[in-house]
Amino acid sequence: MARMYYEKDVDLEVLKNKKVAVLGYGSQGHAHAQNLRDNGVHVMIGLYDGSKSAQKAKEDGFEVKSVAEATKESDLTMMLMPDEKQKKVYEESVKDNLKEGQTLAFAHGFNIHYNQVQPPEFVDVVMVAPKGPGHLVRNVFTKGSGVPALFAVYQDHTKKATETVLAYAKGIGATRAGVLETTFKEETETDLFGEQSVLCGGISELIKLGYKTLVDAGYQKEVAYFECLHEMKLIVDLIYEGGFERMRYSISDTAEYGDYVSGKRVITDAAKQGMQNVLEDIQNGKFAKAWIKENEEGRENFLKTREEEYNTEIAEVGRNLRSMMSFLK
């Protein structure tokens, strides 16, 4: 069984005499920076000129510097800007400001695993990947808890990379819930697979197909929306809280029986093969190459698809219904 590291296993003092630069002040950036500061770590924020986040970071009491300055002055530099921006930022502002023994950190392995960022041999390269969005990382921290995380060491120049990355994980509150060791390869490939096959791509297509099946059969659009999309949160929350057994305990016996006899009629071997194909494209770099190319060419297909999805019938029905749900406001 994989080992989990908790508060008692990690020494936060490792970071107390270091300066940490958090590059980016978005979802994860604000959470990492504030949690580290609350734990007594010296934190500065590195942002590009004209960043919309600069004012917010200053209002939150942080010293804001350019990415280059923050990198140069820090002992640990955490890259928290979006994946598609990291290569450019690294090449222009980080690469030439790294010094021997510095720690270069990431919250996702994409750019290291797919060789978009190629650090020099004289730095440690690590990852701390919280298993939750930034607002949750911050919110549960303020309540005395934490979001679990994965950690990895890609390059250990100082022979102290593991204690450094674990201290960082403790600094953001992750060891309160537990952190699990992985590799950049495993984190990247499993994270992308989960997003594409289940959490985002898979669930979106399942919902849309269920909705369309009911509407095509003559049922009201609003009823189809409630049954196939709105109630999804109720079920997912139960699974999140206590696994499939909690969900099945909480639903009716009729629903549970339908789960057993019909689930496999929908998610067939064809779906399994589709998942395998998705995983292979992640493993062999085909997906990464396509995403990198999409960004290099201006995101035309990406933005077109986003617009098309916004204008689908189910999206319009959802917006109308949610506008009448006062409890969502």
UniProtKB/Swiss-Prot annotation:
Acetylation keyword on record: no
Active site (record annotation): 108
Domain KARI C-terminal knotted: 183-328
GO process terms (BP): isoleucine biosynthetic process; L-valine biosynthetic process
Cofactor(s) required for function per UniProt: Mg(2+)
Annotated cofactor note: Binds 2 magnesium ions per subunit.
Binding site for Mg(2+) 1: 191, 195
Family (UniProt): Belongs to the ketol-acid reductoisomerase family.
Function of the protein: Involved in the biosynthesis of branched-chain amino acids (BCAA). Catalyzes an alkyl-migration followed by a ketol-acid reduction of (S)-2-acetolactate (S2AL) to yield (R)-2,3-dihydroxy-isovalerate. In the isomerase reaction, S2AL is rearranged via a Mg-dependent methyl migration to produce 3-hydroxy-3-methyl-2-ketobutyrate (HMKB). In the reductase reaction, this 2-ketoacid undergoes a metal-dependent reduction by NADPH to yield (R)-2,3-dihydroxy-isovalerate.
Protein name from the UniProt record: Ketol-acid reductoisomerase (NADP(+))
